[in-house]
Amino acid sequence: KIKVMIKTVKMKDLKFDANLFRPMSTGRAIDAHFSSTRGIMRGTNYAIVGDPGVGKTTVMLDILADLHNRGQKVLFISGEMNSIDMYGYVKRYPKFGDLPILFMGDHCEENCLEVIEDVLIEGWDCVLIDSMAEIVNGVMDTTKGYMSSKKAESEILNLFERHNKAENIKEINTCFLVIKQVTKMGNFAGSNRFKHMMTGMAHMKFTPDGRIFYFSKNRRGGVHDARLFNLAPRNRVGWMGTLAMNEIE
């Protein structure tokens, strides 16, 4: 048996930067769903899942752009789109044009893990990743020698953990918003470590009442009802009223 060094802590002995507990606000209704203090908390991780075509990328870019417009340093890491694809988004949502974006397709001949490490080391308040599966595949494909998907995911989660703890140049506790795929049955697809590292899990789906956004898990509290939304308005997602979870078909 290998002897493992076990460490226990007492919370009264730990000290954190007060800024860690100040929410990042978009100034819109969705803030109340991310935390009981109305906003996205620093140093957290959120998985985003939902029906195909429901608007996961659009909604999360809208949230990211609103954070950016209120002074947060944000980054979009896209493993799904290229700059031509993104141009179409910007025509409909001009505020997306101001977002710093790392297109992983521009670095397909380089080591993707090192590329992500190099950009994250700057220090960011909030990073949106679309999608975890594509980033994992990119890391696997560009690593010298063989790397399993489990190992690739683990390396990415290690990065999340380091930057959650502000291990970057600006010592910022980074929040990660991670768009994640589900199985054909609609179940969450991911390792136990991924699930445990997620502060919360947000869902978007089509219902007879319209598109909804809700959390099935959120360690930071927040509104438990589902928030209706639509993509009709120009340059912003339209957040509407709420539905109790027992009213959703």
Task: Pin down the residues of each PLM region.
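Short, well-ordered alpha-helix to beta-strand connector turns
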Residues: G43, G71, W124, M198-T199
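Phosphate-binding P-loop
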Residues: S35-G43
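Phosphate-binding/switch region of NTP-binding enzymes
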Residues: N158-E249
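Conserved beta-strand segments of the P-loop GTPase G domain that flank and frequently precede/overlap
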Residues: F76-S78, L102-M104, I129-D130, L177-Q181, ...
